[in-house]
């Protein structure tokens, strides 16, 4: 690779050299900035493939950046490589596979981190499944992924020696497997197999015969004993003769066996091929069979519904529409022509006779030909279509006399449903017309021959009169179809010829449907017209005008082609004529307006459905497919059956359409007919059944196309066959149900679509993405539903937001990530998405969500459904982004956030916030530059793991450090668990999102928080679901997460929860207390060099009072804990607190403890302030730890605010899992109690706990004592490990806030891990004493579960989180114990240990400290920057990274405590 890279740049000419240099710099830039978004990866992948001549340079630089990058970014680079490797062959750049094969073993060794290894393993599995690389290569890569570095190097050497060559050789042998299979399936001929088997059978018989002959031989050729018995010459000669005979027979036998042995392999090969072929066939057949089953179910359901509706339908003559009564005569007139056409007997006989009389096969063939656009008919139909487009009236011009008559007939039929016979007659008329229209003149001729033109003319005239009576003008005809089948229109236009083929059927369908309502009849007519000859067109125009459905002439055509349109929508529909017929049902379920989903059927069906005639609708629906697919008869039959009244009309009418329909798809038709037959209401169907049989011959011709399309369709299950299945599964209303719903003609495709989409029904999505297949449609559905969801969960960007809006947040998460991966999860309960969100994404879902993004990215290019839903996801994510450009929040929240603090925040620390914000939006990491993508891909990867990384790696630098640093792995590990728990618990942890939040929390969180605020106010019930509605209401969004878990401990719990994110809850109230000036930057407390600085920072930081909060960013810091949390965890915690920020300014006050309200306010307003602060010192760090440090005096205010108290109460509530007091308060007790637990459970937790514990000294500050004796500053090196957010700025422990509440604790821990897990823990005790043990502990406690899980899920998260937190706390407890004083303060005391006051204030301070510590962890992420930042805080006992920079923000890794459920 290196050589290749060198070669690429070392060109002879200077120009080439300069170009190579430009290429390399461009490569560096591109590889450095690639994110985990599909757009970024696919765009860079395409660029690489286009520059394939520089493949060696590209791969070399890819490897270079893989080595340099943090784990999340490494995963992004792996996604990029995957995209290139999988697409290079298709794009004629296969060289990339070999180039990457050289470096992949080493690359695999660089992505062993648990946060990304799962995603990479998934990539390898895809390569294996798709034979991208040989199995040996994949095995080697997997080994590299799981081995140590030394063995990796050996592996790489071995692999470079052997596998690459082997791979190049075996590429032809392995890859061919799939190609061979497809070749076998394509070339398999059953006749050859039969011949081989017969040959074998013959040879077997021959051998058997020879065997028998040998057994009857008198001489035992093989025995020498007989020779001894020879005595005389005669006997010897006799024996010799017999022996020779026997030996010749034996020779023949042996030769026969040899022959069989030689022929055996070919036979076995043939049998193997047959096995492969028939297996493939079986799979396809199973899909079709299942589709038919679902279709049958749909038909049965529809029959039931139709039966119910039939009882409610008025008599045709009593139909509300006047047209029906007028139609009565028309049908009679129609009857004559129908009989003339060859259906003189009863309707069903007529149909049959018509089938026979009219060139049925021809008609069917013509239908097929129509699809192929025969010359003669093609011109006619094209003209007709154009005419229709231009003028409905002109259509009649095509066949002037006929069209007029049919139109009239149709009008009459539609106006008078009870005139089924007449109607039937009319359809035949249109049928001939259609035939003429159709490419097959033969059909037209026979039809015309059978039809009495005079009768047709009279019928048409009567129809026209009826139309006039109806008050519909032919001109308006085009409109009717439009609403009903907008989708079909396009398609329809495409396939006018087929439509023409089915024109007579459509007429019959129309007639049969007429009985339902004039509108439905009109709709049917318009369809028929489209398909029928000009006469039919005229009818359709008249009908359409009558219907009032705005269907342009082109629409009529489109309807006739609707099969095609439907097919376009349901591209497979057309192919599956049967399904097409089924589709009417499906489309209803899908599109709700069959016209769109189905082809023509769709259009008519839509009209009918809109009319609200259940029977008519089905009839129309069937008819449409029939028309489009040549199913008219079938559809008609089916429709006829549904409407009892219609059946009479339909019977004759259907019989005729069935002729065509028959040709379309006999089996489906038969099935439909059977279903209809089964239903007493479908008496007309029985008549149609004969047609079905007739259609059988005709149907096959269309059947093939239908099969052709059906295959994909069934596969997708999106349309027709597939759709029913998907719809049922998704709980989407069945077509029948859909039909029932849109009973009025008002139902149009658009409205139906919107309606469907809104509810998250699968119908629209499936309609939208029929090609991808059921999966796609499903995900799409999900997307749609999620999108509905999303407004609430726009905060997907920040898992923490979930804490604030536990439910909503997950929704957004789901929307962006989970939706992709867990469409059903997110989608399932669209309507209840908010409540459901939390529970909706089960832990696994969350995890999947986290993982899936990677998958989606991996798959986006390979899976249509993935791709389809991914775009949707991306669109949703985009939407989320739109909502929260800064973070994924609803626009309003976003606006709040943006206006108040988000802008500042983002502007002030674009690096931190921008990335985070971006990140938060999509999976939360897409937006972020590199960290964002890393995080995002953390999400896709082992999302849980990646969370921690995301959190830590969220910051670009930290991310890098992350992979390299000792704790990155452990951190990740911790994070992984945490994320796992958190993710499962709720979206908040969705590892990717959560990570994103870790960094993005500030922006994301803020926006999310705002979202939450909005949501909190608007969906308290959801919160209540989790028993946190009240809290949520108060804290608004900031507490949303915590609220979910802390109804009673709003302040404390929130802080705990938020602490996890931001530990700003307490700060909120403190913020309120503190004057704005303090809050502004708060007097930077001198103290702070240690965790106490963290505390201080909470208090000392510019504490944001309510007002401050209102002012984005200014006093955020000040909010006791919240301020602190915001300070360093602005992004992470902002989700809860920040979102609330603006709206929560007052809420903050209300929270008193700075609960979520304060948090929110703090986050929102402080966000700006804090962002700058962070930038000044360490970005987020600065807010928590620095502010604490600088604003020691501030802490008291926050404490005073009462946040401490609130916090305490909240803490206890939250703490139930843990000691409530400590939890609520500082977790000092909790911490002690749980510290060991944390230690044991999660080293990082420990660290986090320790880090949290470290903050206790600041608690003193936080509590009443602004400058409580600051505990000795934690060792500068250890501040990170110690986790004193404020103090450990130099190497602040990763902020736990990004993590779930429980994660919060872990977060600080990872930084410790960075410093050394053991050391961190140990240090923490030291630091703890100097830092705020209580704070850390409390932070952990606070953040642990409650915050994590807003709501049951949140609670779960909290519970687990708390458990984790407890563990964390336990560690901190230890630390606190080490610190003694901080923890000594009891719940509050823990926080204030150092200070001494352990009460509420202490609690608050603790939270603040925790926040600080959290910040600390972040700085750990980018310790160096923090060190720079520290300079400003050199006064701190322990230099802390100044908040100036985002590094602390970025640097702190949030412990990945998997939330405990």
Curated annotation (Swiss-Prot):
Positions with biased composition (Acidic residues)? 369-378
Q: Compositional bias (Pro residues) at which positions?
A: 1267-1277, 1290-1299
Instruction: Write down which residues bear the modification named Asymmetric dimethylarginine.
Output: 1366, 1424, 1430
Q: Which CDD domains match?
A: CID_RPRD2
Q: What is this protein called?
A: Regulation of nuclear pre-mRNA domain-containing protein 2
- InterPro entries to which the protein is assigned, alphabetical: CID_dom, ENTH_VHS, RPRD2_CID
Composition bias type Polar residues, residue spans: 397-416, 567-583, 742-752, 927-954, 1031-1055, 1174-1189
Q: Which Gene3D superfamilies match?
A: 1.25.40.90, 6.10.250.2560
Can you give the residue ranges of the CID domain? 19-149
Give the multimer and partner information: Associates with the RNA polymerase II complex.
Q: Where is the composition biased (Basic and acidic residues)?
A: 352-368, 379-394, 1417-1434
Question: Could you tell me where the Gly residues compositional bias lies?
Answer: 1151-1160, 1382-1391
* Ranges annotated as biased composition (Low complexity): 417-426, 473-491, 553-566, 593-614, 758-768, 1141-1150
């Amino acid at each position: 690779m290196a050589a290749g890279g060198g070669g690429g740049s070392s060109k002879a000419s200077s120009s080439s050299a300069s170009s190579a240099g430009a290429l390399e710099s461009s490569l560096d830039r591109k590889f450095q900035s690639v994110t985990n978004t599909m757009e970024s990866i696919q765009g860079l992948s395409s660029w690489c493939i286009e520059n394939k001549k520089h493949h060696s340079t590209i791969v070399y630089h890819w490897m270079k950046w893989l080595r340099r990058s943090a784990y999340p970014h490494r995963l992004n680079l792996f996604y990029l490589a995957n995209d290139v490797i999988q697409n290079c062959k298709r794009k004629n750049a296969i060289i990339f596979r070999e180039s990457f094969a050289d470096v992949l073993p080493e690359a695999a060794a660089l992505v062993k981190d648990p946060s990304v290894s799962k995603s990479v393993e998934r990539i390898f599995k895809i390569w294996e499944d798709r034979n991208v690389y040989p199995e040996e290569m994949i095995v080697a890569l997997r080994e590299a992924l799981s081995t140590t570095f030394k063995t990796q190097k050996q592996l790489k050497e071995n692999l470079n020696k052997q596998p690459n060559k082997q791979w190049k050789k075996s590429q032809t042998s392995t890859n061919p497997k799939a190609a061979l299979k497809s070749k076998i399936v394509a070339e398999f001929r059953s006749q050859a197999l039969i011949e081989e088997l017969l040959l074998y059978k013959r040879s077997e018989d021959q051998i058997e015969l020879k065997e028998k002959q040998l057994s009857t031989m008198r001489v035992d050729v093989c025995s020498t004993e007989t020779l001894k018995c020879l005595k005389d010459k005669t006997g010897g000669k006799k024996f010799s003769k017999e022996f020779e005979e026997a030996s010749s027979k034996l020779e023949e036998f042996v030769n026969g066996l040899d022959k069989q042995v030689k022929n055996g392999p070919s036979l076995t090969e043939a049998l193997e091929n047959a096995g492969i072929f028939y297996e493939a066939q079986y799979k396809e057949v199973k899909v079709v069979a299942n589709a038919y089953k679902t279709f049958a179910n749909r038909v049965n359901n529809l029959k039931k519904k139709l039966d119910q509706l039939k009882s409610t339908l008025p008599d045709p003559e009593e139909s509300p529409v006047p047209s029906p009564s007028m139609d009565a005569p028309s049908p009679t007139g129609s009857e004559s022509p129908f009989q003339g056409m060859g259906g003189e007997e009863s309707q069903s006989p007529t149909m049959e006779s018509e089938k026979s009389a009219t060139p049925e096969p021809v008609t069917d063939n013509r239908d097929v030909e129509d699809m192929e656009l025969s010359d003669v008919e093609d011109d006619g139909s094209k003209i007709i279509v154009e005419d229709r487009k231009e003028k409905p009236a002109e259509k009649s011009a095509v066949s002037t006399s006929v069209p007029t008559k049919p139109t009239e007939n149709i009008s009459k039929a539609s106006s008078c449903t009870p005139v089924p016979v007449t109607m039937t007659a009319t359809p035949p008329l249109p049928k001939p017309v259609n035939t003429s229209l159709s490419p097959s003149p033969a059909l037209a001729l026979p039809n015309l021959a059978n039809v009495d033109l005079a009768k047709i003319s009279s019928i048409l005239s009567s129809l026209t009169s009826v139309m006039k009576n109806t008050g519909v003008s032919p001109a308006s005809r085009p409109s009717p179809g439009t609403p009903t089948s907008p989708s079909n229109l396009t398609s329809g236009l495409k396939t006018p010829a087929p439509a023409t083929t089915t024109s007579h059927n459509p007429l019959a369908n129309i007639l049969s449907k007429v009985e339902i309502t004039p509108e439905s009849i009109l709709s049917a007519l318009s369809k028929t017209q489209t398909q029928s000859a000009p006469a039919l067109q005229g009818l359709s125009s008249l009908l359409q005008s009558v219907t009032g459905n705005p269907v342009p002439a082109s629409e009529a055509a489109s309807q006739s082609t609707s099969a095609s349109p439907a097919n376009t929508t349901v591209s497979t529909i057309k192919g599956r004529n049967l399904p097409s017929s089924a589709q009417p049902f499906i489309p209803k379920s899908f599109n709700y307006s069959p016209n769109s989903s189905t082809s023509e059927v769709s259009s008519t069906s839509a009209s009918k459905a809109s009319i609200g005639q259940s029977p008519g609708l089905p009839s129309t629906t069937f008819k449409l497919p029939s028309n489009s697919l040549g199913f008219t008869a079938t559809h008609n039959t089916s429709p006829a059956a549904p409407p009892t009244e219609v059946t009479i009309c339909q019977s004759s009418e259907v019989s005729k359409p069935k002729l065509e329909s028959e040709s379309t798809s006999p089996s489906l038709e038969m099935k439909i007919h059977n279903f209809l037959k089964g239903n007493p209401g479908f008496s007309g169907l029985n008549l149609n059944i004969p047609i079905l049989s007739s259609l059988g011959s005709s149907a096959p011709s269309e059947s093939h196309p239908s099969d052709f399309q059906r295959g994909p369709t069934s596969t997708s299950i999106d349309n027709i066959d597939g759709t029913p299945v998907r719809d049922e599964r998704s709980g989407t209303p069945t077509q029948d149900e859909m039909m029932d719903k849109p009973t009025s003609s008002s139902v149009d495709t658009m409205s139906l679509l919107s309606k469907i989409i809104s509810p998250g029904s699968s119908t629209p999505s499936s309609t939208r993405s029929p090609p991808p297949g059921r999966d796609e449609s499903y995900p799409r559905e999900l997307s749609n539903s999620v999108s509905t969801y999303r407004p609430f969960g726009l905060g997907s960007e920040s898992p923490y937001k979930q804490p604030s809006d536990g439910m909503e947040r997950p929704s957004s998460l789901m929307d962006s990530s989970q939706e992709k991966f867990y469409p059903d999860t997110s989608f399932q309960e669209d309507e209840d998405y908010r409540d459901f969100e939390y529970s909706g994404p089960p832990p696994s879902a969350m995890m999947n969500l986290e993982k899936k993004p990677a998958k989606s990215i991996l798959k986006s290019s390979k899976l249509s459904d993935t791709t389809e839903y991914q775009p949707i996801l991306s669109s949703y994510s985009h939407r989320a982004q739109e909502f929260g450009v800064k973070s994924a929040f609803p626009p309003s929240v976003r606006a709040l956030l943006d206006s108040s603090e988000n802008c500042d925040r983002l502007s002030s620390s674009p690096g931190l916030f921008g990335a985070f914000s971006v990140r938060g939006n999509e999976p939360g990491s897409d937006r972020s530059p590199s960290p964002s993508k890393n995080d995002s891909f953390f999400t896709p990867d082992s999302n849980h793991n990646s969370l921690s990384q995301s959190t830590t790696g969220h910051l670009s630098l930290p991310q890098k450090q992350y992979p390299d640093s000792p704790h990155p792995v452990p951190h990740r590990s911790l994070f992984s668990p945490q994320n796992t728990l958190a993710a499962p618990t709720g979206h908040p942890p969705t590892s990717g999102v959560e990570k994103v939040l870790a960094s993005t929390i500030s922006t994301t969180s803020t926006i999310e928080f705002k979202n939450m605020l909005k949501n909190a106010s608007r969906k308290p019930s959801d919160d209540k679901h989790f028993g946190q509605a009240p809290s949520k209401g108060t804290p608004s969004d900031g507490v949303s997460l915590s609220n979910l878990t802390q109804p009673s401990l709003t302040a404390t719990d929130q802080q705990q929860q938020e602490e996890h994110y931001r530990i700003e809850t307490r700060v909120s109230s403190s913020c309120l207390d503190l004057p704005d000036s303090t809050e502004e930057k708060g007097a930077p407390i001198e103290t702070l060099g240690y965790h106490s600085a963290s505390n201080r920072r909470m208090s000392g930081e510019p504490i944001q009072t309510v007002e401050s909060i209102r002012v984005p960013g200014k006093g955020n810091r000040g909010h006791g804990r919240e301020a602190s949390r915001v300070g360093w965890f602005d992004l992470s915690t902002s989700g809860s607190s920040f979102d609330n920020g603006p709206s929560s300014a007052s809420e903050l006050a209300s929270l008193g403890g700075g609960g979520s309200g304060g948090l929110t306010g703090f986050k929102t307003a402080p966000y700006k302030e804090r962002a700058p602060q962070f930038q000044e010192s360490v970005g987020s760090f600065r807010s928590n730890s620095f502010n604490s440090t600088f604003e020691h005096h501030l802490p008291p205010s926050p404490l005073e605010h009462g946040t401490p108290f609130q916090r305490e109460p909240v803490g206890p509530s939250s703490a139930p899992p843990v000691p409530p007091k400590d939890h609520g308060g500082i977790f000092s007790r909790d911490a002690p109690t749980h510290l060991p637990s944390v230690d044991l459970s999660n080293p990082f937790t420990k660290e986090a706990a320790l880090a949290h514990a470290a903050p206790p000294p600041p608690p003193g500050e936080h509590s009443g004592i602004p400058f409580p004796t600051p505990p000795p500053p934690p060792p500068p090196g250890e501040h990170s490990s110690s986790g004193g957010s404020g103090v450990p700025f130099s190497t602040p422990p990763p902020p736990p806030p990004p993590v779930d509440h429980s994660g919060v604790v872990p977060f600080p821990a990872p930084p410790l891990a960075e410093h050394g897990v053991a050391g961190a823990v140990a240090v923490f005790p030291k630091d703890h004493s100097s830092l705020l043990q209580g704070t850390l502990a409390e932070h952990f406690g606070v953040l642990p579960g409650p915050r994590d899980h807003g709501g049951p899920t949140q609670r779960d998260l909290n519970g687990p989180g708390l458990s984790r937190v407890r563990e964390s706390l336990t560690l901190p407890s230890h630390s606190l114990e080490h610190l003694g004083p901080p923890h000594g303060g009891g719940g509050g005391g823990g926080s204030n240990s150092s200070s001494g006051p352990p009460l509420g204030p202490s609690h608050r301070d603790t939270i603040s400290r925790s926040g600080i510590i959290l910040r600390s962890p972040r700085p750990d992420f980018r310790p160096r920057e923090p060190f720079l930042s520290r300079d400003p805080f050199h006064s701190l006992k322990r230099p802390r990274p100044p908040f100036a920079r985002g590094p602390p923000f970025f640097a702190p890794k949030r412990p990945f405590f998997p939330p405990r459920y």
